[in-house]
Regions:
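Catalytic Walker B motif of ABC-type/P-loop ATPase nucleotide-binding domains
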Residues: 157-161
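Conserved ABC transporter NBD signature motif
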Residues: 61-72, 76-77
Length: 274
């Protein structure tokens, strides 16, 4: 086990009756890094997160989080982590600030209002602080959810498919929030089925397939697993998501460099009947 690993998983197994979900999973997450667990639906990503969060007991293997064993020291693990599920766990009746204050008080922290205001500013939600969460966009709800999970400054945070169901603009908002977490030293383990999300965010990526980690490394290391590509000079066409973000001014550069005149529709020409 690496000394500076915030999360260590070795030989992890889990079955539901006859269904073997995890078949000997091994990986480590370095402190202060973003680690992406990439896999299709049903690969076992959420099962791993639930075990790491002490919500589910493993059948076999050794799992430690922040130096604590998830089975023998579950209470210590829960003090060290925060979990954000696939859907934002926010109270729609309350305002954004009230949600944060409530969590701070439930954790018996002093200065709940100050904590709330600091997180609102950190996640660019100050202007919406007094609005009910029911009026928030999907991206705003997810950012608030992540902000709530940081109350108490947990060293490790688990994000289970944090952009599920979000539009491209909201996904970009969440991506920026996740990058901010790592810059401040928080260890982030996120699960995703979006390849571009893992590519953009993660320091290391593990691919989970049929209950096993079949590849684990940096993006550059994973690319080395493919045979050398044949060099061809082609014009790179933007993806639809890149077009959408550029047109709406959310391409990450803060500018809109789109030639809107080219977007004007022209009726198709038709031949006159003879």
């Amino acid at each position: 086990m690496t000394a500076d690993a915030a999360v260590h998983v070795h030989g992890l197994e889990k079955s539901y009756k006859e269904l073997r979900v995890l078949r000997g999973v091994d990986f480590e997450v370095a402190r202060g890094s973003i680690f992406a667990l990439l896999g299709s639906n049903g690969a076992g990503k959420t099962t791993i997160v639930n075990i790491l969060s002490t919500l589910l007991r493993p059948d076999a293997g050794m799992v430690t989080v922040d130096g604590f064993g998830v089975s023998a020291q579950a209470a210590d693990v829960r003090e060290s982590i925060s979990l954000t599920g696939q859907f934002a766990a926010v109270d729609e009746i309350l305002t954004g600030r009230e949600n944060l204050v409530l969590v701070a008080r439930l954790r018996h922290l002093k200065g709940a209002g100050h904590i709330a205001d600091d997180l609102l500013a950190r996640f660019q939600l100050t202007d919406a602080a007094g609005r009910r969460v029911a009026t928030y966009s999907g991206g705003m709800r997810r950012r608030l959810d992540i902000a709530m999970s940081l109350i108490g400054n947990p060293p490790v945070i688990f994000l289970d498919e944090p952009t599920t169901g979000l539009d491209p603009e909201s996904r970009l908002e969440v991506h920026n929030s996740v990058k901010q977490l790592a810059r401040r030293g928080t260890t982030v383990l996120l699960t995703t089925q979006y390849l571009d999300e893992a590519e953009q965010l993660a320091d290391r990526i593990a691919i989970l397939h049929q209950g096993r980690i079949i590849a684990n490394g940096t993006l550059a290391e994973l690319k080395q697993l493919l045979p050398p590509a044949q060099v061809e000079y082609v014009e790179k066409q933007p993806s639809l998501e890149e077009v959408f973000l550029a047109i709406t001014g959310h391409d990450g550069n803060g500018s809109n460099n789109v030639n809107h005149s080219r977007l004007a529709t022209t009726p198709p020409t038709t031949k006159e009947p003879r």
